Amino acid sequence: GRQMARLPVDVKLARMLVAANTHSVLHELLIISSFMGIQDPRERPAEAKEAADNAHRQFTDNASEFMAIINLWRGYRQAHEECSQSQLRKWCEKNYLSYLRLREWRELHRQLLITSQELQWPLPAWQDVEQRLVLGLTESKSAQLHYALIHRALLAGLPTQIGHKNDKGQYEAPRKR
């Protein structure tokens, strides 16, 4: 509880981060929870829905929307490192992403990173995380375990968002809602 109170995000997101620390997937959950703490930076204007969908497709992950968020972060991070501010704005525009919301995401991620360091939560080097994420694209047992641990940490903060498809093809939430 005390650790969660220090995190500058909603209680559900803070719970995910505590679980992520336990499961050693904190780096990935810092990315996902900071994304969930802002308005979605992906833009989809009515007049360019198909073009926006095509631009966003480069970040998709067939198995998980949460992994797509990590892909988006990696793409943004690379563009942020390689581009000037005006080039980054053009990259955002070309990819139908809100420059201001991406900046807000980066700032919230930075705040969460600093707080996690103050809490003395261990963080692997970014290169190690990159290697884990690349391995996540394979079907190895360790990659599957890593993927499962990310989703287990996510579920810690979203217990009411879990659903089960019944025999009639309808989804039921916990407590049969």
Segments (PLM) and residue ranges:
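Second RecA-like catalytic domain
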Residues: 1-176
